[in-house]
């Protein structure tokens, strides 16, 4: 796959500290060609504790990307060949899912201990995605989201862990009611603030040309469906342009994200605002 990407973060108009943290990696592998990995964390908690939580999770996942993922991709730790009952089908995506669950549980415990020491509530949401070959794996905890753009349509491939989402799932609240509810910011899952995590996973096949947008609630809350299509469509490839390096398109993506963030601030969004856009397409 060939990737064009952009990422932008802004502390917003009110908060003195940007409690969001994010990371984007694109790497060439021997076994799977180019892969892409991105995550957005939205820290919550008083003072700088939210910033600590989100940054700590991103650092842990950066360590995983460099030191643990290579072993999964090269299949060097696979022992199923010693098991005659095994069907010998190696599935790196499923192993990554297990890794992410374990790491999130580990970080949840560490941040809870830190919060106890500081006598404060410490936590962070997360949404992240990895693209390997023609497959993707997405995960979220909290209300940071991932949107997919394909065939000129946008869909959300994550599921909020929030009070209002649970009410909607159970048929007790409509979308319009959720959007104006005083409980709309209450989270039911957050790394560092719950006893047991229940990450939401989404796995799928990528077509010839698809885009993924990772964002915190400060980005998606006031973004309309038409805005989302406009933003994600900007990653479309123009055959008449010389963008073989992808650098011009990367800059264009970041410019559109920045412009939209300014629009959100003008419309009254006060939270930190962060987003990553990844376009995956067949190499030309």
Residue locations for each model-derived region?
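PP2C/PPM-type serine/threonine phosphatase catalytic domain
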Residues: 1-284
């Amino acid at each position: 796959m060939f990737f064009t990407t952009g990422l932008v973060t802004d502390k917003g108009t009110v908060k003195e500290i940007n409690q969001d943290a994010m990371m984007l990696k694109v790497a060439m592998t021997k076994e799977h060609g180019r892969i892409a990995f991105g995550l957005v964390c939205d820290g919550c908690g008083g003072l700088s504790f939210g910033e600590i939580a989100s940054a700590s999770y991103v650092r842990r996942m950066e360590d995983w990307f460099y030191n643990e993922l290579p072993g999964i991709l090269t299949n060097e730790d696979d022992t199923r060949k010693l098991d005659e009952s095994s069907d010998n089908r190696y599935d790196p995506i499923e192993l990554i899912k297990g890794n992410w669950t374990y790491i999130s549980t580990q970080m949840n415990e560490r941040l809870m201990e830190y919060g106890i020491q500081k006598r404060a509530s410490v936590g962070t949401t997360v949404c992240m995605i990895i693209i390997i070959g023609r497959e993707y794996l997405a995960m979220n905890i909290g209300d940071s989201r991932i949107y997919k753009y394909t065939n000129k349509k946008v869909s959300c491939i994550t599921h909020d862990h929030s009070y209002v989402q649970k009410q909607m799932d159970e048929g007790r609240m409509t979308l319009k009611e959720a959007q104006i509810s005083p409980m709309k910011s209450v989270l039911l899952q957050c790394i560092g603030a719950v006893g047991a995590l229940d990450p939401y996973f989404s796995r799928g096949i990528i077509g010839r040309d698809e885009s993924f947008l990772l964002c915190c609630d400060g980005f998606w809350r006031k973004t309309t469906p038409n805005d989302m299509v406009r933003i994600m469509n900007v990653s479309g490839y123009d055959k008449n342009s010389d963008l073989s390096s992808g650098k011009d398109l990367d800059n264009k993506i970041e410019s559109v994200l920045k412009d939209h963030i300014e629009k959100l601030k003008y419309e009254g969004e006060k939270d930190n605002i962060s987003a990553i856009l990844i376009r995956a397409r067949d190499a030309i």
